[in-house]
Design a protein with these regions (language model features):
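Short beta-strand elements
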Residues: 121-139
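Extracellular Ig-like/FN3 beta-sandwich strand-entry sites
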Residues: 42-44, 62, 106-110
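Short, compositionally biased P/S/T/A/G/V-rich stretches that sit at domain boundaries
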Residues: 4-46, 51-54, 136-139
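Short, solvent-exposed loop/turn segments at the edges of extracellular beta-sandwich modules
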Residues: 55, 118-122
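Short flexible loop/turn segments that cap and initiate beta-strands
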Residues: 51-79
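Aromatic sugar-binding surface patches on proteins
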Residues: 86-98, 105-109
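Beta-strand-rich interaction surfaces with strong enrichment in secreted/lumenal proteins
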Residues: 35-37, 81-87, 99-102
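Hydrophobic beta-strand positions in extracellular immunoglobulin-like domains
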Residues: 51, 98-100, 115
């Protein structure tokens, strides 16, 4: 990925965040890592995100990412972890697993993801505001 060139006088103080949601079943399961946005209670939602410094075009593995989900009148914060390791160095992203709880109402679950790197840069991800593509709990 190429880093964008800063405009004169413009500070690159915000991280660029992007990602997706998938099923997070154990390895070998037919639906593991399959893109999806509709989940039933008890199913594992996988959040995969990246946070990039716009100046360098690179990520800092020490960056902290947190998912903030709003449902049933409460906000649930889920910290993400760096997925990259010695056996899988190509996995340059963060992950978090959230099993849909029994008290989650059916319908859209609104969420955002925030990030902060060791240098104080921050960023926020919000999914497109299109109902058909939102994280949705189904019966």
């Amino acid at each position: 990925m190429l880093a964008p060139s800063p405009i004169s006088g413009q500070a690159n103080e915000h991280l660029v965040l992007f990602g997706d949601i998938v099923y997070f079943y154990p390895p070998g399961h037919a639906k593991n890592c399959l893109l999806n946005n509709q989940f039933k209670r008890g199913e594992p939602v996988g959040f995969r995100m990246n946070a990039v410094n716009p100046t360098t075009g690179k990520r800092d593995r020490a960056t902290e990412l947190v998912i903030h989900m709003n449902y049933a009148g409460k906000t649930v914060d889920v910290p993400m972890r760096d997925r990259q390791n010695e056996k899988q160095p190509e996995r340059e992203f963060w992950v978090a697993k959230w099993v849909v709880p029994d008290d989650a109402p059916t319908g859209i679950i609104r969420y955002t993801v925030t990030a902060k790197d060791p240098h104080g840069r921050t960023g926020e991800f919000k999914p497109f505001d299109v109902q058909a593509s939102q994280l949705t709990i189904v019966p």
